[in-house]
Every structure is written in C-alpha cells, then in structure tokens.
C-alpha cells in the first residue's frame, strides 16, 4: 500500500493527540481537597485576596500558599489551597493589575538571544517577579515547528509546578517573533495548568505588551464536576489544538483577532495589557510579517516537518 500525505497527516495528528492526552493525564494530580474547594458554592469572599496578596497566612495555618514547593503539596492543605483559590478568583474577576514593575524588570531580558520563564506573585497588591530562569537554547537552536526561540517543556514545567499567581515566558526581540501572540504549543501547555485551576493566568511578555491567557472559574468548575475531569481536560485541550491548527491552515494572514475569537468560543480569554487596542497594532504588524510568521503552524507545515524528520532518520541509518 502506498502511503499518502493524508495517511502521514493522520498518523501525525494521532501522535500529537496521544502526546497531549498523556501530558494532561500525568500532570493532573486531582485531590479530593481541591475538588471540594473548587466545587464549593461560596469559595470566593470579598477582601480575602487583599490579605493573601501581602503574604500573610491565616492564624490557624503556619504556611502561606506561596510557600509550598508544589501544587500537589498545596492541594493537600485545605486552608492554604482555599486561600489561594479565593485570591485567584478575585484577581480573574477584576484583572485590574498594574504591570509596570514586571515590564521594567523584564525589559533587559527581552534583548537576550533566548526566552526566559518564571513566576509572578502579588506583593502588596502589585505583581512582582519571584523567579526567572533562562532557556538553555539560543535563538536558532533546537528549532521546533518553525519557532525562532523556544523554552523546553521540562524547564517550563519545573517552574509552573510551583504555586504562583502567574507564570510567564518571554518572546524576545527577534524580528518576526517579537510580538505577543502565543504559539499553539504555548496554548496547549498553558491549558494543562489553567484548567487544573493552577494560577490565575499564564503570560507572554514581549517588548510592546503583556498578553495573558486565563480561564473563567466557571469553566474549571464545569470540568471538575465531571466524573472523569482529567479525560475531559485532555479532550478540551486536544479539541482546541486541532481547531487552531485547522483554522490557521485556512486563514492567511493569521492575526490576534482570529486567535482571540476561537479561544473565546472555548471559554478562554487572551487579554492584552495595557489595552486591547494593541490588537490593532499587532494585526497590522503581522500583515507585514505574514510571509515570515511561523508562530502557528499549518497542516501543510506539519507535513513538511514530518517529511524532514523522516529524511534525516533515513540518511542517518
């Protein structure tokens, strides 16, 4: 039987689907404590976030939620996890945050030849960077699906598995890659944490803006109310992955408005700070770079990457 391009594409998408599902299932450490708090009707009460953001723990709890080494450890402490969940929901409900301190601190890293990632917590009501680490790969090294720079999944996971209000990574000033549009890999990785209720948002910080992927509490509650929330999470992420890939294959040029609309259909928001007016600037900029822009790959590009991998494998044997 002659293997056609469609056969190869089917194999590749099936492989991607298995990878996404496996990562979600291995990452989703669901505890009864987390489930009870997330499904609780009155878990958000006004003012709690202000106290928590100052880094003060409840009198009956020695450890503040930011002091735990992992989300898994935090999930075992009912009082601390509830404190986090309350603060998280209040922030997502308002999103009235001043990112000036973060943007000033990250500015020098945007001129580096690699991506950086880290964690952000609220300090006296203001977002502050509490950890930042570099990618081991310079721009042009270990290219993955046409990206100009990348942050390895194992490093990003090491950071994102620690409790924080926000996790971020940078898009450095590298020509066509300097914008704030998240890649399809950024989105699928981010959703593994957001749908678990871990963090209020994942940020993509570029020279001109801070972009945030966030999920409304109701989306998380609906998932956790299911008998098998982990499988539902995997299915949702895979659906989004496939939808974005197929839409990107049909729409050219691809803009932030296109991305925002598709994500909203799934209950996911991509918010630009300081203002969504930046969509106008970004859309115009992407039109200029439409021939170079590879942050989202098409089905055709997936096939080309697969054929490149096969050629290298054949020549090395």
UniProtKB/Swiss-Prot annotation:
Assigned GO CC terms: virion component
Predominant cellular place of this UniProt entry's protein: virion
Record's subcellular location: Virion
Keywords associated with the record: Late protein, Virion
Induction, per UniProt: Expressed in the late phase of the viral replicative cycle.
Family the entry assigns: Belongs to the asfivirus F317L family.
Annotated protein name in UniProt: Uncharacterized protein F317L
Organism per entry: African swine fever virus (isolate Tick/South Africa/Pretoriuskop Pr4/1996) (ASFV)
């Amino acid at each position: 039987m002659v293997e056609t391009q469609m056969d190869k594409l089917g194999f590749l998408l099936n492989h991607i689907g298995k990878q996404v599902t496996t990562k979600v299932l291995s990452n989703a450490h669901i505890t009864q404590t987390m489930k009870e708090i997330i499904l609780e009707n009155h878990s958000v009460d006004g003012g709690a976030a202000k106290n928590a953001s100052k880094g003060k723990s409840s009198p009956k709890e020695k450890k503040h939620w930011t002091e735990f080494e992992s989300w898994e450890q935090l999930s075992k402490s009912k009082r601390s996890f509830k404190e986090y969940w309350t603060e998280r929901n209040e922030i997502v409900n308002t999103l009235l945050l001043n990112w000036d301190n973060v943007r000033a601190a990250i500015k020098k890293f945007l001129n580096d030849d690699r991506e950086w990632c880290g964690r952000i917590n609220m300090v006296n009501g203001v977002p502050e960077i509490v950890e930042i680490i570099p990618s081991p790969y310079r721009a042009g090294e270990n290219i993955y699906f046409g990206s100009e720079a990348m942050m390895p999944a194992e490093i990003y996971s090491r950071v994102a598995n620690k409790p924080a209000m926000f996790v971020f990574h940078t898009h450095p000033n590298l020509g066509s890659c300097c914008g704030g549009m998240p890649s399809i890999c950024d989105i699928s990785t981010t959703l593994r944490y957001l749908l678990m209720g871990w963090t209020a948002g994942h940020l993509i910080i570029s020279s001109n803006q801070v972009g945030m992927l966030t999920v409304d509490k109701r989306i998380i509650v609906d998932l956790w109310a299911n008998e098998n929330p982990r499988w539902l999470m995997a299915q949702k992420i895979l659906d989004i992955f496939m939808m974005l890939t197929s839409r990107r294959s049909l729409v050219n040029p691809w803009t932030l408005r296109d991305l925002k609309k598709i994500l909203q259909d799934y209950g996911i928001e991509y918010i630009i700070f300081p203002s969504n007016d930046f969509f106008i600037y970004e859309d115009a900029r992407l039109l200029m770079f439409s021939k170079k822009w590879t942050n989202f790959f098409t089905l055709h590009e997936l096939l080309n990457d697969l054929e490149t991998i096969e050629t290298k494998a054949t020549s090395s044997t």
